[in-house]
Amino acid sequence: MQNISPKVQNQINMLQQMQQQMQTILSQKSQYELAAQEARRAVEELKETDDSAAVYMNVGTVVMQKPKSEVISKVTEKIETLEIRIRSIEKQEKMLQEKFEKLQSQVRSEIEGRKTPDAN
């Protein structure tokens, strides 16, 4: 990296930061997708449960018995919120990926422009 200009070194550092941001975004997305999947599974189970069955739900630090329809409604609402977050993260991911690819292309051009031909 001794022959690389400070500008290119800075761009390389930016690429590394973008990679870290991408990893963070992908981790968040994965967590939200897992939570949404678990919530969907819970709704499916609740729908198969008899209407007279006791259904419990966390309310803060307390677990309370609630009507099945209310629990389904709350969990469905949670799924919708998670899906909105996932879509938002996907937009961030796409924008960051585009910026990354553009900067990566610039860095490659800079580096390739500085290469000297081999004397073979």
From Swiss-Prot:
What Gene3D superfamilies does UniProt report for this protein, alphabetically? 1.10.287.370
As one GO molecular function, the record gives:
unfolded protein binding
The reply to whether Chaperone figures as a keyword in the UniProt entry is yes
Q: Where are the transmembrane segments?
A: none
What are the GO BP annotations of this UniProt entry?
protein folding
Quote the cellular component terms of the Gene Ontology held in the record.
cytoplasm; prefoldin complex
Compartments, record wording: Cytoplasm
Which keywords are on file for this protein? Chaperone, Cytoplasm
Q: Where this protein primarily resides, as one coarse class?
A: cytoplasm
Spell out the HAMAP family in the cross-references.
Answer: PfdB
Primary role? Molecular chaperone capable of stabilizing a range of proteins. Seems to fulfill an ATP-independent, HSP70-like function in archaeal de novo protein folding.
Q: Subunit notes for this chain?
A: Heterohexamer of two alpha and four beta subunits.
Assigned protein family: Belongs to the prefoldin subunit beta family.
What this protein is called in its record is Prefoldin subunit beta
| Species of origin | Methanospirillum hungatei JF-1 (strain ATCC 27890 / DSM 864 / NBRC 100397 / JF-1)
